[in-house]
Amino acid sequence: EVLEDGQPQKIETFKRISVTGTPTGGGEPAREIRSEYVEEAEAAREDVRMFVIFLDDYHVRRGASMAVREPLIRFLQNDLGPLDMVAIMYPLTPVSVVRFSRNRDILAGAINNFLGRKNEYEPRNDLEQQYANYPTETVERIRNQVSLSALKGLVTRLGGMREGRKSVIVVSEGYTYYLPPELRNSQAGISTPGQNGVSSVTGNDPNEFRARMML
């Protein structure tokens, strides 16, 4: 039985689709994605799974980002098939330039470069320079907005690529407006004593060594 808004719907056609990321007998082989045209054509196939790994560097501590690299690369190497398409995105990545790939070496290299910046406020681009003199609490709100807006844009783009399921893997420690007193500063771009631009909240904090992966 299929319901829509609580009302039963008539089933006119039914098709079972089992997708494993591996070509079936007689199926088309995986094509190397070298252009947007090939990307769109491959994404339209029913036997292709699509994944986006969203590396939320604004909300992952440096140590946690290093710890999560290995399990992400294992996922690429062991859990994906040759047909699967994967893209990597950061909060500041324009959704228009997000590209999918089947090259596991390139994807693994990108993951190995992932470095979290949670509680680090040194500006690295013109956008961040604009609010470098804001209080750290304000910067955290801006970072939340940037990250969530990027996810919304990503979901919109994925929805326009084809019907069916797409998966977004969000690597983040979560969103919060709270900062411990030692990280509060009237100017985010100026390091507090003992920080030198890097969060001094390490030690036994378990979040320093763990990032949540949310599907």
Regions found by a protein language model. Give the residues of each.
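Scaffold/interface architecture of coatomer-like assemblies
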Residues: 1-215
